[in-house]
Amino acid sequence: MTVVDRVTAADSSAPQTPLAEVASQFLPRIRDLARKMELDRRLDDDLVEDMEAAGLFSVIVPKRWGGAGLGPHELNEVMETVARGDVSTAWVTGFYNFHNWFLCRFPLEVQEELYAGRASVRCAAILSSPGTTERIGDQLRVNGRWGYATGMLHASHALVPVTIDDGLFWVIVPREKLEIIDDWDVAAMSATESVTIVAKDTVIPETWAMPFAKMMSATDHAGMFHGEEVMRLPFSALTSAISSLYVGALDAAVEISRERLNSASGVNSPPRIERPHARVRWVNAFQTARVMHMVRDHATQEAIEIARRGTPQTLEEEASRGLHGGMILRTVRETLRDLVDGNGSSGYRSDNHLRRMSADIAMLSTHAVHGEYDVMMDRYARWLLGMGLAPDDPGARMT
């Protein structure tokens, strides 16, 4: 399919099924595969292929390449929906979408090569200690080792951090030029394929490198030729998609717990629905889920409005938005834990979906970028109190 064909198809006046609805059609299949994927420590091959073909990895890819060209709210809906099926699958789905958005900020000739014949590029990306580079004419020799390359086992490329002239850059490296070390052996988020990758004297074009700050920027990048507003937003306007994963997991937990209210938890126990405490536990989770939706939607719209203003967000605004995400994560984690405890010993079976979701969300609360609750809350408190940046605050923030 040519670029013209893809643009024509994307601009068709025929009614399009909302991508959140498309995602919902995958839910039974995702749930059926969740335990197997957890044990295999990777997503199902056919599932990944079919989700990509359905457009679930190209939600925010511009229409020029055959993507949907949608925005933060629509990405939230897709993430929330997929998370109702499995948190690991949603995590990879979100990252594939984010990383496509990053790739669409590179120069046109780079994008033409990457998106030739496809509407999405399955790409891992890492934000950790940078590797090294050496210039060889108009090319770069890259060396480095990076862990947590989410989605790498199904990816064709990776974005890895390196230093170039003392600046932090992300460079695109094709999968065939990387060594993959399958060391992702964890008790939660097992299917995310967050393996370690290594580049040894890997040579890439210098045009495949971009400063990290430009990647996060609203308009200081080479992808401004795209017409969609999402390409004129900073990355901070997209990060509520991660919160949407938490919200979707809680929605699923409320649904599962509602179904289990009519079951007993012991030989001499009445059905849970006849016990006041069980009913209160469930309705608290139900209301918490409704509130988390409102917080997420408010945070998303607030970020979009700040971006449309055309000036960088202040530290106070960054802290305010961070508090939304931190509160959603911690609240969902605690609510899931409470629901698992209220489901009796069967809630701890290895194949229990509620148990898996609770463990996955608990693990995400330790994530170096999206978690570490105590560190982030102290940081946001300082910023809101006007104390400014501290020496150990990250110099490269996803804002």
PLM region spans:
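Basic/polar N-terminal segments that are highly enriched at the extreme N-terminus
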Residues: 1-21, 25, 395-399
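C-terminal helix-coil-helix/basic helical segment that borders enzyme active sites and/or dimer interfaces
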Residues: 31, 35-38, 291-327, 337-348
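Glycine-rich flavin
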Residues: 45-53, 57-155
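Generic structural signal for well-ordered, non-transmembrane alpha-helical segments
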Residues: 24, 248, 283-290, 322, ...
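Glycine-rich phosphate/cofactor-binding loops in nucleotide/flavin-utilizing enzymes
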Residues: 343-399
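Charge-rich, acidic-biased intrinsically disordered regions
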Residues: 48-49, 270-277, 305-322, 345-363
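A short core secondary-structure module
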Residues: 148-185, 193
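Glycine-rich beta->alpha junctions and the first turn(s) of the following alpha-helix
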Residues: 188, 194-290
